[in-house]
Structure formats: structure tokens, C-alpha cells
């Protein structure tokens, strides 16, 4: 099955909730590293990719469309251009694998969806993308399930640790350090002085070498 992946990406000042531990230049580099992991998984699954960017950006392994409207409007514009099944996948889920994506696209349903933590949506696969409209932010998983019902779509909900792990907060970085072997995002964090640490209650978190943080 031929299908196309749509990856929203913010190349300028992304991931502001990581500002407590990464400056803007570092956050931009880290976001690019996570994007590389996602694109690698997409390509290995046999899919071509288009980046839906808020600012000018170039990538040798993906098409780029720059859209200045809000996220949902930009995604829905893109879905209207597709004449084949489509995958909407966020650029901040670096643990995703090609096998995970294949699991999504092999669904017998009209749509498969991976919920994110806190009610969000990390990935949607649509056999008929032009019939669907995206509604991200807030409890988007519930919104997307409602929209699928309105479209008359059958839906498979896929529960996956790797695909549901999006990176937004400092506490999320530990998942990359533990589970991200071979990923560009883990390499970036390690090269930036991050490592696994235990707090006084024995909970797992991350710490950063003060020397690296000062560079």
C-alpha cells in the first residue's frame, strides 16, 4: 500500500516547555534530532514524507510545505491535497519504529489512531484523508474519535508505549535516555551532557553536566 506521511514541524523556537533545561538554539537542534528519528522510521516503513513547517526549512529526505495558519488549518489543507492514504505523525515521538508504523497501516479499519498522554493524539492513519478534519489541542483524542464517527469511519485504537511517548517536558527526556538506543535524539542529549539520575525518593529523572549546560 502506498501512503504519505504528514509531519507537522516547528523549526523556530520549538518545545518551549524545555526552556528550563535547553536554550532556544539547543531546543531547535534537539527538535531536529527528534525529527530525524521520526523521518527514519517513516522511510523504513515504505512511506514518503512531507513536513508541514511554520517557517522556511529544508530536508533532503522529505518534501516541505510552509504554512503560516494555525496547526489544524494547515493539516486540513494538506489532507485535502492527498489522493492516497495518509499518516499524520507528530515530530516529537522519537521512539517510534518502522514496525510501529506498519502496525498502523495494516489496520482493517478505515482509520487507526494512537492516543498520546493527557488526552492528546500522536498518530492518525487515514485511508480516506480527504473525508477527515484534524482537531488538535486539548482532548484531541476524543475529538478525533468523534470526528471519525461523524465521517462513518471504523476505527482501531492502538496502544503503544513508543508511539504514545511524546517529548514535551524535562521529565520526558528520561524515556529517550532509557529506550532510545541508536536514536539521533538520544545521541544529542548524551552529547549535551544529559544522563539518568535518581532523586532523593528514588525516582528516575535526568541531570545535566553543569559544564555542558554552560557551553
From Swiss-Prot:
The keyword GTP-binding applies. GO terms for molecular function: GTP binding; phospholactate guanylyltransferase activity. GO terms for biological process: F420-0 metabolic process. Its EC number is 2.7.7.68. Keywords: GTP-binding, Nucleotide-binding, Nucleotidyltransferase, Transferase. Pathway: Cofactor biosynthesis; coenzyme F420 biosynthesis. It catalyses: (2S)-2-phospholactate + GTP + H(+) = (2S)-lactyl-2-diphospho-5'-guanosine + diphosphate. Gene3D superfamilies: 6.10.140.50, Spore Coat Polysaccharide Biosynthesis Protein SpsA, Chain A. InterPro entries: CofC (IPR002835), Nucleotide-diphossugar_trans (IPR029044). It comes from the Archaea. Disulfide bonds: none annotated. The keyword Nucleotidyltransferase applies. Homodimer. Guanylyltransferase that catalyzes the activation of (2S)-2-phospholactate (2-PL) as (2S)-lactyl-2-diphospho-5'-guanosine, via the condensation of 2-PL with GTP. It is involved in the biosynthesis of coenzyme F420, a hydride carrier cofactor. Belongs to the CofC family. PANTHER family: 2-PHOSPHO-L-LACTATE GUANYLYLTRANSFERASE. This is 2-phospho-L-lactate guanylyltransferase.
